[in-house]
């Protein structure tokens, strides 16, 4: 790939953790903090510039401005602010303040009424504070994360539709924002598949991100590392390039949100560009014998993850396999030629939920 190298950015979660760590250090040292080094969820060390640094008695407030890199979204430039007070208790109490959404609907992996600070950023924030507290006389802290202007930013997101009210969400599984939605990233997907072919690899694994790639590697440990390719939202590009490069077997590994979009025939899965079709998912549910009242509940679900929760509770987990079958069939049609496709669905911990193996238009399904 030629041209400018893409610049990565940082998630709202990573910036919040940096701000919280800086505020904790300010309380312990009593000196202005200009920069703070933190460890991201992916274990990478990063140095952040601290914008706001304010000490008022027992409370410190620090902020870090989000740089989304070469894939800026509506939170690019957001000032992630942490207000911290240290305590003697063995607990870090974390809540969202102004500009951080509150959860009002199920299906998001967070309790209703809780601030929309996702589990991995929540863990990272606490870890960074505890790192600073080592060797001090304090054991815990009360932390509030806020985002000035967060309510306005949220209007440009799907938060309100998802039941996230009053601001943005604090997100990020790795701490890094990869520029998936750029033309240059699309080019890198093509290049990665071409490279795999050059090395004699005839089975590739297309994943939607770093987390699903790690899970895919755990599921398929015998494959060459070059077989695993992060396609981001460009699943369609990955399929078409596999055909062009005469790849024998293409495996897709993802979680229910992205796979549900693929089952709906969407081959460019950016969350801002398409939403999950719960009507389609309810139709799939009916096809496997789900009672009508549950099918209606699925149709009214908040997210694809919510659909999964409904199916688990009602005992119809087989829907995950059915989704994988449809994904394999839709991707095969998108390929436009005879190509063998498999699809694996994993949960957020990497557990295999469903699969369709070796689908081909000529042989059908081999489950």
Swiss-Prot record:
It is an enzyme of class 2 (transferase). It comes from the Bacteria. Keywords: Cobalamin biosynthesis, Methyltransferase, S-adenosyl-L-methionine, Transferase. It holds the Pfam family CbiD. Pathway: Cofactor biosynthesis; adenosylcobalamin biosynthesis; cob(II)yrinate a,c-diamide from sirohydrochlorin (anaerobic route): step 6/10. Its EC number is 2.1.1.195. GO terms for molecular function: cobalt-precorrin-5B C1-methyltransferase activity. HAMAP family: CbiD. This is Cobalt-precorrin-5B C(1)-methyltransferase. The gene is cbiD.
